[in-house]
Amino acid sequence: MLFLASLAAVTEAEKTSPLRCGHFGASGLSERHLSCGDFAGVLSTWDLERLATPVWQAQAHGGIINAMDAMGGARRGYGAPEIVTGGRDGRVCVRDPRQHDAPVAAFEPPEGLEAVPDCWTVAFGDSHCDGDRSVLAGYDNGDVKLFDLRNGQVRWERNLKNGVCAAEFDRRDIAMNKCAVATLEGKFHVFDMRTHNKERGGYAGVEEKFPTGATLWGCTHLPQNRDLWMVGGGDGTVSLYKYAYPDQRRATDADGKEYGVTGEVRCLTYRQLSTQPINCWDWSADKEGLAVCGSFDQSVRVVICSRLSRQ
């Protein structure tokens, strides 16, 4: 069941360039610096108690910064604090906030393209030791790419035939398990990231169609249960889905090579929250079922989803 709650603004600040995305993930629990990307391609970090000037800023992209993810600031898990951004210029850039003048990794769009695809979403994952971390990126032309930060190269890519609005690993601080990818025209995909088979297109995946066909703006996994995630729809609905693993997650083909086997996806519940798209959703890491979401109706809503531990 879904319940609505209310909240009040604590502080406000207006900036010259509109802000497109933001994240606390590269900040420590004590300082709580907010990293933001704007329409001018500037990446900046703000102290919420001193909003007059940024702590630091850098020109990260040649156009709008469409998406951002960050991790490592809370000193939990593995790896340095890092911020990854995806922009209209098609670039994916990774920055360490401690040395922010230049990216520690940058993945450029292929040369010779008539039109450079926008990068619409980025997500960290596979951060299971100090030496490993990957980035999952989705583009407006339907491409989804997995970048290996250790080797600085594309580890896997696939075209889903619809613009990729959101992508997320079920857990980013473990060896890759599975990921969810949401696209235009009401489709989302779940890929099993444990077994790679090049001849079969890389990782096995299952595709689901949203009943209304509305654009899916986000897919956010529950921190307390990686097999549950919320999907935000362009029709103003949110839907809670569950993934059921198969009896065996891998099989062997006639050549003796292993390939992944996908499970099943089912919708547990849904709720109409707005008449406008639900474009962002974030779960509380401390309180199971507590979440906040944003919508194109310029409203921010606090939501409580109950009985999740029984699913």
Residue spans for each PLM region:
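Active-site/pore-lining binding-face segments in mid-to-C-terminal subdomains
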Residues: 196
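Intrinsically disordered, low-complexity acidic Ser/Thr-rich regulatory segments
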Residues: 258-266
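Blade/loop signatures of beta-propeller domains
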Residues: 1, 254, 258-259
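WD40 beta-propeller repeat fold
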Residues: 1-147, 156-174, 178-191, 206-224, ...
